[in-house]
Amino acid sequence: MLTAQQIEKLDWEKVAYMMPVIVQHAISGDVLMMGYMNKEALNITISSGKITFFSRSKQRLWTKGESSGHFLNLVNIYPDCDNDTLLALADPIGPTCHFGTHSCFAPAQTEWGFLYQLEKLLASRKTADPDHSYTAKLYASGTKRIAQKVGEEGLETALAAAVNNREELTNEAADLMYHLMVLLQDQELDLSCVIRRLRER
């Protein structure tokens, strides 16, 4: 997180004391929005943990989500190499855009952003009707059955690679990823847990 010393080192004069801030989803990497912060807005953002801008149209401080409840919870914030732009990593509560989309730049989405949305969808299927959802049926079948499916798909993925069938390898890898994500959700885990463990190694 930015220190008071780093905040003072930002090139405020260059940007007329209105620092451009790009807000990026801390997990998916999707760019959510951009806005401007003066020093007060930046200090409030860091102290409150909720991204706060200076609204040039309203001429006042504005905490994203103050009326809708769709806050952008601050994870971290970084200056760029010229100290005239900030990148804020955030955990959004609800949609970011006032049009109801996840990003003000929708439908733009990264590949990792799709995985994040898929993970949210799989989590929501835990309470769905097993008669109308294959994923819900998997959850209802229990952990052992889900784990068995991961094993089966892993074997099929390996066999496709062994015979150099790239098309089938892609298909089987997708099936394996899907079932692995279901298993992680079943165990109250997610891809972020796996990524953190990989970083530790």
Swiss-Prot record:
GO terms for molecular function: ATP binding; phosphoribosyl-AMP cyclohydrolase activity; phosphoribosyl-ATP diphosphatase activity. Its main location: cytoplasm. InterPro entries: His_synth_HisIE, HisE, PRib-ATP_PPHydrolase-like, PRib_AMP_CycHydrolase_dom, PRib_AMP_CycHydrolase_sf. The lineage of its organism: Bacteria, Pseudomonadati, Pseudomonadota, Gammaproteobacteria, Enterobacterales. The keyword Cytoplasm applies. GO terms for biological process: L-histidine biosynthetic process. It is found in: Cytoplasm. It catalyses: 1-(5-phospho-beta-D-ribosyl)-ATP + H2O = 1-(5-phospho-beta-D-ribosyl)-5'-AMP + diphosphate + H(+); 1-(5-phospho-beta-D-ribosyl)-5'-AMP + H2O = 1-(5-phospho-beta-D-ribosyl)-5-[(5-phospho-beta-D-ribosylamino)methylideneamino]imidazole-4-carboxamide. One of its GO terms (cellular component) is cytoplasm. In the N-terminal section; belongs to the PRA-CH family. The gene is hisI. NCBIfam families: histidine_hisI (TIGR03188), PRK02759.1 (NF002747). It comes from the Bacteria. Pathway: Amino-acid biosynthesis; L-histidine biosynthesis; L-histidine from 5-phospho-alpha-D-ribose 1-diphosphate: step 2/9; Amino-acid biosynthesis; L-histidine biosynthesis; L-histidine from 5-phospho-alpha-D-ribose 1-diphosphate: step 3/9. This is Histidine biosynthesis bifunctional protein HisIE. Keywords: Amino-acid biosynthesis, ATP-binding, Cytoplasm, Histidine biosynthesis, Hydrolase, Multifunctional enzyme, Nucleotide-binding. Residues 1-114 are annotated as: Phosphoribosyl-AMP cyclohydrolase. Pfam families: PRA-CH, PRA-PH. Its EC number is 3.5.4.19, 3.6.1.31. Residues 115-201 are annotated as: Phosphoribosyl-ATP pyrophosphohydrolase.
